[in-house]
Swiss-Prot record:
The active site is at 46 (proton acceptor), 113 (for glutaminase activity), 151 (nucleophile). Pathway: Cofactor biosynthesis; NAD(+) biosynthesis; NAD(+) from deamido-NAD(+) (L-Gln route): step 1/1. PROSITE patterns: CN_HYDROLASE, NITRIL_CHT_1. Deamido-NAD(+) binds at residues 375, 404, 516. It catalyses: deamido-NAD(+) + L-glutamine + ATP + H2O = L-glutamate + AMP + diphosphate + NAD(+) + H(+). Keywords: ATP-binding, Ligase, NAD, Nucleotide-binding. This is Glutamine-dependent NAD(+) synthetase. L-glutamine binds at residues 119, 177, 183. GO terms for molecular function: ATP binding; glutaminase activity; NAD+ synthase (glutamine-hydrolyzing) activity; NAD+ synthase activity; nitrilase activity. Its EC number is 6.3.5.1.
């Protein structure tokens, strides 16, 4: 019986729908794990073959058939090593989320996921079934009994306990667990608890990469049979993680493992957003992006994110001044572009704005200017930016933040124009925090201090500031965090110390702007409750509370 078992954990990105390419890569990685790392077992993330989440691709018989052919091809290419590969298995009229054990050219066993998450961003019960006969997978490698579970199974005590009862002392857990603030500490605590409950050693592998609004952070870990969690692998990093499992002590010895100890929340959020932009562009065929740069904090932060994601040479900033644009705004935009090495173009919106006013003048005769004229300026900018992206290629990044999306402080078909919204799940107060943090991690100031310290303004009328229409952001974001992220009631929010009139004003804005959010571009989820697939409120909604 061997003293140790070498495990190679493939913390890589496997794009959704790219079945043939993923299969080729999995085969190549299996060979690399065997030949270069000397691994006895190689494991891949949850649904690595199809990518996660495949969503309604799982309703297409042809897609499932393609996955079946691909897993057989991977199995046929697997020799001299055991591979654990996640994929969607069709069995008659039902589909299972499975991990198959491949060895010696064939599928040896297949484990079917037992706990299907159906909350927040997850809707696995829409697609998958649980095997009514139950599922347990335990196999031996070099005399070591190894079990398999999948992601959500570990959040319940019974699946791991059952696997250990089946003889497993080491359990491999492939995952597709998206990032959100505080997730790392939550995962580590859970893993330690499960290991202590059962005495099992756990190899927890998470996928990495951006998929539309989800960003998977990797941060894979191993936990010994005493509940000790080894420092997590670098978050948002594509890498091999190779460990030796020492059977006599039920512990792991890392051989190839780029670990991280303490990483700040701001650093993790930054990496998540950068990876979200990077992968959204790469997976949708965009090599460059456009950013409308106003001299304000939101667009400045988006520009810095874009540069970190794609490089300065793939980013073009555009100033779009109007009669209300302060000279300081133009200067700060130019300062940032010079500092980051970004090309800056300037297109004045006055001719477009004046043309719209002239065209609408006869219909608007006798009516006082209001938000309509302000929105015309924003929509003039949207038309110009979309035209540039259309003519020269590239993706327009929109610059709104979560506070603005929540209360509708954004112009539909104006500053909401764009294909991806990097700040969509980041409140305005967090925007300032991230900007200040980003300036501490490099010699070059990514965001001019003048941008950070000036009062926020849409500059759509003279002497305008955001606080003309909204409570101070620390108040607004506090209310929104309780209402949106924590689903607290009006009464609970007032009891937390916020004035009833302000609470009513903010909650009404959230309600009446649902229609705008339904038309907003996707953006990376970094909070426990992001707008989009995990907050599905009706647009036509009479409930208030």
């Amino acid at each position: 019986m061997s003293e140790f078992l070498r495990i190679a954990m493939a913390q890589f990105d496997f794009p959704v729908g790219a079945v043939a390419q993923n299969a080729e890569r999995i085969i190549a990685l299996i060979e690399q794990a065997r030949d270069e790392h000397g691994a006895d077992v190689v494991m891949f993330p949850e649904l690595a073959l199809s990518g996660y989440p495949p969503e309604d691709l799982l309703l297409r018989p042809g897609f499932l058939a393609h996955c079946q052919v691909a897993i057989e091809r991977i199995a046929a290419a697997t020799h001299g090593i055991v591979a654990v590969v996640g994929w969607p298995q069709s069995a008659g009229s039902v589909v299972y989320n499975v991990a198959s054990v491949l060895c010696d050219g064939q599928v040896e066993q297949t484990y079917r996921k037992r706990e299907l998450p159906n909350y927040a961003v997850f809707d696995e019960r829409r697609y998958f079934e649980v095997d009514p006969n139950g599922s347990r997978c335990v196999f031996k490698v070099k005399g070591v009994p190894v079990g398999v579970l999948i992601c959500e199974d570990l959040w319940f005590s019974e699946p791991l306990a059952d696997t250990v009862c089946g003889g497993a002392e080491l359990v491999l857990v492939p995952n597709a667990s998206p990032y959100e603030r505080g997730k790392h500490a939550q995962r580590d605590a859970l893993l330690a608890e499960r290991a202590r409950e059962t005495g099992a050693a756990i190899a927890y592998l998470n996928v990495v990469g951006g998929q539309d609004a989800l960003v998977f952070d990797g941060a894979s870990v191993v936990v010994d049979g005493h509940g000790r969690v080894h420092p997590a692998a670098a978050a948002f990093s594509d890498q091999w993680l190779v460990v030796d499992y020492m059977r006599s002590e039920r512990r792991f010895v890392p051989l190839q493992w780029v670990a991280e100890s303490e990483v700040s929340i701001n650093a993790l959020v930054w990496r998540a957003v950068v990876r979200g932009v990077q992968d959204y562009c790469r997976k949708n065929g965009f090599s460059k992006v456009w950013v409308g740069l106003s001299g304000g904090i939101d667009s400045a932060l988006v520009l810095a994110i874009a540069v970190d994601a794609l490089g300065a040479d793939q980013v073009t900033a555009v100033r779009l001044p109007s009669r209300y644009t302060a000279e300081l705004s133009n200067d700060l935009a130019a300062e940032q572009c010079h500092s980051l090495g970004v090309r800056l173009e300037t297109v004045a919106i006055e001719p477009v704005f004046e043309g719209l006013l002239a065209a609408l003048g006869p219909l608007f005769a006798g009516m006082a200017p209001d938000a309509t004229e302000e929105n015309l300026q924003s929509r003039s900018r949207g038309v110009i930016l979309m035209a540039l992206a259309n003519k020269f290629g590239g993706l327009l990044l929109t610059t709104g933040n979560k506070s603005e999306y929540a209360v509708g402080y954004a112009t539909i078909y104006g500053d909401m124009c764009g294909g991806y919204a990097p700040l969509k799940d980041i409140y305005k107060s967090q925007v300032f925090e991230l900007a200040q943090w980003r300036n501490t991690v490099s010699d070059v100031l990514a965001i001019p201090p003048g941008v950070i310290h000036r009062p926020p303004s849409a500059e759509l009328r003279a002497q305008q500031t955001d606080q003309d229409s909204l409570p101070p952001y620390e108040v607004l974001d506090g209310i929104l965090s309780l209402y949106v992220d924590q689903e607290q009631s009006r009464e609970d929010i007032i009891a937390a110390g916020y004035a009833a009139g302000v609470v009513d004003y903010v909650l009404n804005l959230v309600k009446i702007n649902e229609w705008k959010r339904h038309q907003a571009a996707p953006g990376p989820k970094v909070s426990q409750r992001a707008f989009g697939r995990e907050r599905r409120y009706p647009i036509s909604n009479a409930y208030r509370g």
